[in-house]
Amino acid sequence: MARKSFGQHFLLDLNVTRKIARLAQVGEGDTVVEVGPGPGGLTRALLETGARVVAIEKDSRFLPLLAEVAEVAEGRLELVEGDALKVDAAQAAGGPAHVVSNLPYNVGTQLLINWLTGPFRPLSMTLMFQKEVADRIVAQPGDDAYGRLAVIAQTLCEARTVMDLPAKAFTPPPKVASAVVRLVPKAEPPPAEVVAALERVTAAAFGQRRKMLRSSLKALGGADLCERAGVSPDARAEVIDLAGFLDLARATLGGADQ
């Protein structure tokens, strides 16, 4: 039933889906956007909390089954047929919303980046990823998994792994383990122009992660940029913490006090 081309692996164990719903900390009066509900295992658990669910599903095979769930959900389940990368999630939600999803493996990272930096800013995100991707989101400086995704995600959100799942929890079982990451946006994130600069800096720095910053950031100012930011030009990207990257981003804009 699952389509490999869609990266589909379904969670059908109600004990697992209920735990994810609890970890999401949603309930009556909340709106939840769910991407890729499939046969509705997690959807049912979210509805049990009393939340309103907006489910975005690309695979039309599941719409009749989800429509049956909607019939007994007393108006709290809305179905949107479409590709989550193209659907206007803010419009679909109709207001502030949380995102809770077992994300399709092939688009999970791109969806997260869209939600972190795009016009739709969720109140919180409780997301299932491949374990490798989850590790990249919560990695710390010096970790093998530390990179651009960790810097951007942790600059904008508090991020932590809240649950690990073995492959056997899914139907069909994937070849890798999975994990649930919870991300809560920070109350005072950096201004948009600083975040845009941070994206440029991290793209350059981690694009050549084994090189010293004086080389990897050469197009942005190299050693001079590092000195203005108070960061060692002889350091490599993998050891620079969030504050260091923010200083580098601000320095590209002409200051470190934005």
UniProtKB/Swiss-Prot annotation:
Domain of life: Bacteria
Main localization (coarse): cytoplasm
EC number(s) recorded for this UniProt protein: 2.1.1.182
Stretches of the chain forming a coiled coil according to its record: none
Compartments it resides in: Cytoplasm
InterPro entries in the cross-refs: KsgA/Erm (IPR001737), rRNA_Ade_diMease-like_C (IPR023165), rRNA_Ade_Mease_Trfase_CS (IPR020596), rRNA_Ade_methylase_Trfase_N (IPR020598), rRNA_adenine_dimethylase (IPR011530), SAM-dependent_MTases_sf (IPR029063)
Binding site for S-adenosyl-L-methionine: 9, 11, 36, 57, 83, 102
UniProt keyword list: Cytoplasm, Methyltransferase, RNA-binding, rRNA processing, S-adenosyl-L-methionine, Transferase
GO function term, MF aspect, one: 16S rRNA (adenine(1518)-N(6)/adenine(1519)-N(6))-dimethyltransferase activity
Reaction equations catalysed: adenosine(1518)/adenosine(1519) in 16S rRNA + 4 S-adenosyl-L-methionine = N(6)-dimethyladenosine(1518)/N(6)-dimethyladenosine(1519) in 16S rRNA + 4 S-adenosyl-L-homocysteine + 4 H(+)
A GO CC term assigned to this protein in UniProt: cytosol
Main function: Specifically dimethylates two adjacent adenosines (A1518 and A1519) in the loop of a conserved hairpin near the 3'-end of 16S rRNA in the 30S particle. May play a critical role in biogenesis of 30S subunits.
PANTHER family documented for this protein: DIMETHYLADENOSINE TRANSFERASE (PTHR11727), DIMETHYLADENOSINE TRANSFERASE-RELATED (PTHR11727:SF7)
Family: Belongs to the class I-like SAM-binding methyltransferase superfamily. rRNA adenine N(6)-methyltransferase family. RsmA subfamily.
Protein name: Ribosomal RNA small subunit methyltransferase A
Lineage: Bacteria, Pseudomonadati, Pseudomonadota, Alphaproteobacteria, Caulobacterales
Gene it is expressed from: rsmA
